[in-house]
Amino acid sequence: MSAVGIIAEFNPLHSGHEFLLNQARLIAKKDPIVVLMSGNYVQRGEMAIMSKWDRAKAALQSGADLVFETPFSTAVEPADLFSLGNIDQLAKLGVTDLVFGVEDANLNFAYLGSRIAEIPQNHMDFKDYSQTYSTQYNQMVAHEVGHEINQPNAILGLAYAVANHNLGSPLKLHPVNRIGAGHDDILQRSGVVQSASAIRNLLLHGEDTSNLKYWMPKNEANILAKQKVYPNWNLLYPFLKYRIESSSIEDLRRIYQMSEGLEYKMKQEIHLARDFTEFLRRIKSKRYTYARLRRLSLYTLLNVTYDDMLDSFNHESLMLLGFSKKGRQYLKQNRKNIQTEIISKVDKRSAKSGSLALQVRTDRLFEQVMGVDQNFGQRPIEV
């Protein structure tokens, strides 16, 4: 039995994601749909708007057959490492095809991925410090492939393609034209497909939630409407401020991705910034994107060191969040062929090492904010 994979955050899951799952079903036919979903922290360096369990349940109710949690050491990384870790894990799960949404599905992602994969070997050292690495990299991509690719889903799709090429192309790529709004924070006046960013923005600003049921599964909409806390950086900023102010320079230097004196800059500016947005502006330079600095701030808040990430990455396992009857059958039939450890229950032993140890530790802050246990005592959702 083969399987079709989706890499997702579902933060939150909305009508556009339901469309993608439906397209995946057309490709999978009778085979299962396997989702690798980021947990309680997402790639842009933030807490997810709702728990991984609620988002996994929404995915299962929308057509997924298996939902696994992407380890923190892959989920909170730049696009290249995010893609590499996710595709590697999908391949180890026996997934044969990858479905992903893009702005233009006519692009030959497999071909472009093979072309772009050669760029880092030829251009390892980007010297223009007046621009971010990502800006220079995107310019090099445009030069190599003959046209600019600057739409967010296309950029991520290319990262998938490059990672897939570098891993020996274990997955067949199926780009699907995405529907609905772009990635901006503004709700569209017409149409039922809103962006996840716009939905999060509505929730964080305390606006009317009565229309949520038109933009996402009703059960998920009800959970979000009743949720008392919506995690965001303004809520977390006092904790970050305490962490930076109470840490020594040596402690900060051990934080993952802390480089080029940023520990001094963070120490200096945290006293002056009134909120997280101002703090980011104060430490921002042309060498670093806001996404990179948000991730660094998250690593700092959670005290995630280089050693933590290395240990997690070298001992990755996958937490099973939920399954359907078809998903259970797939795991049973392919047990001997699956090349990664699957964990369905967190206990004291499994929580002490590898990716699960980092997951349990980082989830403690989410538990404090949301007031709901995320690991101990939880069992995979069955639909």
From Swiss-Prot:
Molecular function in Gene Ontology: ATP binding; ligase activity, forming carbon-nitrogen bonds; tRNA binding
GO biological process: one example: tRNA modification
Superkingdom, natural source: Bacteria
InterPro entries: Rossmann-like_a/b/a_fold, tRNA(Met)_cyd_acetate_ligase
Primary enzyme class: ligase
Subcellular localization(s) per the UniProt record: Cytoplasm
EC number: 6.3.4.-
Residues the entry annotates as binding ATP: 7-20, 101, 153, 178-179
A GO CC term attached to the entry: cytoplasm
Keywords noted in UniProt: ATP-binding, Cytoplasm, Ligase, Nucleotide-binding, RNA-binding, tRNA processing, tRNA-binding
Catalytic activity: cytidine(34) in elongator tRNA(Met) + acetate + ATP = N(4)-acetylcytidine(34) in elongator tRNA(Met) + AMP + diphosphate
Family statement: Belongs to the TmcAL family.
NCBIfam families: PRK13670.1
Biological role stated in the UniProt entry: Catalyzes the formation of N(4)-acetylcytidine (ac(4)C) at the wobble position of elongator tRNA(Met), using acetate and ATP as substrates. First activates an acetate ion to form acetyladenylate (Ac-AMP) and then transfers the acetyl group to tRNA to form ac(4)C34.
Protein name: tRNA(Met) cytidine acetate ligase
